[in-house]
């Protein structure tokens, strides 16, 4: 089998995006457009990957190196196209680093939804001997190069701006993807000229050279148009985002996940689900999220980098943000509505976290409860603790963060402040309104608040009477 070398064209400016960010670094499904293409190329086990950069080259190359390192993969090779004089000129920059003895698979960095199996068929069509073009039929092919045939054989690709009236009526178009024997590609690139309306070097002109040299030119059709749709504007990016999310929603439902409305679901990472999972509308999942069996997610939740165990319920409007340290929700736990779990939150089985409760870098043991209006930061909370409304851990002294330990079976009354570092002993009770800054013994009642005084003859100050 011939080795495959992937060439990714990513030098364009993307003027219609009206952005300072390189076009291929705009995100779709939480990942840059080009990352989708790179991940697809990696699935083909290519010998090497070469990225053609130009506009925003430093930013793009730096990002791709970092992304490869994060995935434990080798960084791609880079070549620069400066200035940008067309697609043919772009691929000419690859010639010095492209081996002669393989198949060059040429991809576009702004076409994120291409499938690995589609590219594999394209490579197989090439077979190391033919020029294989990925094509698709479009209802409105305006702006695309038309596939001109003689019978079944492809004779040429005519760019839209150079096409005559008859050619503009052709609905089969070239998508920008091709597989070609590398040695022949190099020879044909050397023959390109810019004798056209745009005064650019068109990669598509190699088709006529192939025909003249007696090399078979074959078309490999894409299964659906969305695979080959590119991004040139914010509107097109939004349209592809919806298509991508629908693709992901469909895949999850085929696995048995029950989505209340697949049109109101966003996945910007990876989501693994057990059996009988239910997800209500307008939920966003990012990073790596795992949902166990019988998990229910209420409407309008945002969940990133979290593991949610069997039978847990996440009520409406809950934010779970595990980006740096992850979040774990134990079996049968109840969270929300309007709760916030930040990085490092660890909930044991049957924990209850209610409305307007926030946890960061804190753990709660089995059956512990914080049902409303509370904050726990840098805390270790034991089993069966009841943490009252309005209570907080004061964990930050302005320079360093400190640990609070609340041992098992403690009851913390409402509106308490636990000033870290501090430990509340097992089975103890903290009276409402207390400010606790010293360790307490097990089983005792601790009250740390000012004495209540009532003044019978006190009169409220009055404003002077208006004249």
Q: Which sequence ranges carry the predicted segments?
A:
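N-terminal nucleotide-binding beta1-loop-alpha1 segment
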Residues: 1-19
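Conserved N-terminal catalytic core of the sugar/cofactor nucleotidyltransferase
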Residues: 1-5, 31-124
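Short glycine-enriched, charge-decorated loop/helix-capping segments at active-site entrances
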Residues: 21-27, 192-195
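Short beta-strand/turn micro-motifs composed of small residues
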Residues: 10, 53, 108, 135-136
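Conserved alpha/beta core of the MobA/IspD/sugar-nucleotide pyrophosphorylase nucleotidyltransferase superfamily
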Residues: 2, 171-274
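Conserved core of the sugar-phosphate nucleotidyltransferase
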Residues: 114-197, 204, 215
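Structural signal for interior beta-strand "rungs" in well-ordered beta-sheet cores
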Residues: 258-447, 452-453
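Residues that recognize and position ribonucleotide moieties
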Residues: 26, 112, 171, 178, ...
